[in-house]
């Protein structure tokens, strides 16, 4: 690979993409930030708008409109482009149309001579990330999905509101599909080493509160989409967090979507959200959380759904 730097190319300047661009500029994560979209006038306007704010960025960043040839020397290509999720539509129902869009985008990126890392956010993210890995032949650690980073943040936030602590003080994870079969790992969720599940049960006298928090976490996107059309701030910040871990070589453990290789019950090939060490070499090490028998069964179900869905679009791997 080429020498590692901090050039990021964003493909997709919709609500998620533009929110991500704003987050990256305000955090000063990239040195060079290129935006690609078929809506060239919007890109031009967003670039102008963002550059006007770079004086307030914590470090210099050059924002520009670009084309696919700009991917040649990019360190990180982030793809948010795709058909949006409609009210009532599941992420998996998006699969065929967004896989076709993704294939076209990735072919153009690879044709540029790109030799960096992919970060995928378009839905269904686990399926599309696996598709990119298999279509390009890149090592799994260099093809990363946003996974359940956002879902885990939602869970942490809801728990924090119930327990009266800061979200950052909550150690809790959503793993599996970024979607309807995701699961909360209650057996490991804690605040200062104290079980969240047990605390909720003690406070309420029942197990219903934990289930309510899980359901509200799982279904948050549907509620937001129904009210305002799409989700973008939360996922944009999650993407910024992953990008920062890569570009700054932070060695952070994040629940990104990555390919399993025998972990969590011997599963191989499937991409889904699990705790993974992320640094300038990509998603380099999966951490295998101890799961209860019930949690393992739910995880296996998530794997099965994702495997079956991927099988339905495998034909698109052929040129």
Curated annotation (Swiss-Prot):
Places the protein is found: Cytoplasm
Entry EC number(s): 1.1.1.27
CDD domains with a match to the protein in the record: HicDH_like
Keywords: Cytoplasm, NAD, Oxidoreductase, Phosphoprotein, Stress response
A single Gene Ontology CC term: cytoplasm
Pathway assigned to this chain's UniProt record: Fermentation; pyruvate fermentation to lactate; (S)-lactate from pyruvate: step 1/1
Major site of localization recorded for this protein: cytoplasm
Protein name (record): L-lactate dehydrogenase 2
Organism: Staphylococcus aureus (strain JH9)
Organism lineage: Bacteria, Bacillati, Bacillota, Bacilli, Bacillales
